[in-house]
Amino acid sequence: MHVILNISDSDKHFSSAIEEYQKRLWKDVIFDTLKPFKDDNHNLVIQKETESVIKTIEKKYLSYKKILLAKEWKLLTTEELWNQINWQNCVFIIWWPYGLNREELKSKFSDLKEISFGAITMPHWLAKLVLIEQLYRCKTIQIWKSYHY
């Protein structure tokens, strides 16, 4: 099972597309959405949201492979993503605009991996849509179903 852990107050922009992939993946992917912390102090927002992500992972997903989406990290093809997640429970972390304290996450979770969908900046809901679509492609690889590799 894969979990998409994101900080969000709305996914309304692409909710029908996200729901379509969620139906296709059925129980293979679940969403765990944390409410964003709102404050004018961006450093405080980063601190509070990092704490929230850490607590959630420790409580629910400690045994899962932890993967942080970050625009400046390693680019993967769909096949490489499949090889990274093949037959494992994974929690994918999508952060809110100000980011998370990556050093704190890395020190807390030594098994944290980082992947990227490119150097562009995209809204969290679009990253979520791209991720769930890629997870669907990975699922088709797993079951040997053709889906425009």
Regions found by a protein language model. Give the residues of each.
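Structured adenosyl-cofactor binding patch, chiefly the S-adenosyl-L-methionine
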Residues: 104-149
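Catalytic-core regions built around general acid/base machinery
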Residues: 21, 83-86, 108
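Ser/Thr/Gly-rich flexible loops in soluble cytosolic domains mediating phosphotransfer, phosphorylation
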Residues: 88-104, 124-126
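Conserved RecA-like P-loop NTPase ATPase core
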Residues: 67, 95, 131
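N-terminal beta1-alpha1 ligand-phosphate binding loop
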Residues: 1-26
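Structural signal for conserved beta-strand scaffold positions within catalytic alpha/beta enzyme cores
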Residues: 5, 33, 68, 116-117
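S-adenosyl-L-methionine/SAH cofactor-binding core of RNA-modifying enzymes
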Residues: 26-91, 99
